[in-house]
Amino acid sequence: MAVYDTHCHLDIVASQGIPVDQSLQNAIEANLAGLVQISTDLRSASFNGSLKEKYSERLKMADAFSLRWTAGLHPEAANELESLNGIFDIVRKHRDEPEFLGIGETGLDYFHTTEFVKEQKESLNQHLKLARELDLPVVIHTRDTRQYEPGKTQSVTDTLQAVKEVGGIKGVLHCFTYSYEEAMPFVEMGWKVSFSGILTFKNSHTLHEAAVKLPLECLMVETDAPFLAPVPHRGKTNEPAYVIHTLEFLKKLRSEKLGEDPEKIQSQIERNIQEFLSFKG
């Protein structure tokens, strides 16, 4: 298996009771090829930069297990704009290291409050400009208000506008939860779309439709651990090893709806992940 968990937060998983070395061991035992550790603020960006050295002994026990990482400021932390200089210093310092993948997560989140929309948009714009300057992929987080209606997602619309204004950027819509129509403008620019454990939830009808209609060549899977554990672990602390459940659900869904061969689905998703990992210029 050459599947990665393309988005997780090992530091937050550890704060919920699963130590980092245990998460790594569980992922290795689940036959994952690797994972992408995502930053949300200056503290986690610094943590990510020390991962390889701190857990080198655990990683040596695995044959070719790959640990990649990013640095960025989560939109819900956009009131900490003054920390961007420190985060971007980390990006520039580690940019050419093979383990460093890109920028993020960044984006727009209107779910709890729109109080810091101006700061969120400024943060997103600065991340996008740095991504273009350094030829790095960007990991995008979008979440709308509780009154979300399919096809009317302001956070996605605003993010698309920002991406187009800066131009020349590739990336991934992480933990995608919206419609086919909202994903396609990004797909047409060569972006990837990543599904979390939400895909396995029974009532995720709009997401199921998107997972069937979107081109297989753009799809990836993730955990967003420790959040959003997939069925059959829903309600538990999520971890990278659980990404296999989302993958299996996606394979079953497309096989049943489209008649696609499950092995070919998995092979293509593995290729998609490798393409994403090579977005870094």
List PLM regions with ranges.
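Mid-domain alpha/beta scaffold segments of enzyme catalytic cores
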Residues: 1-281
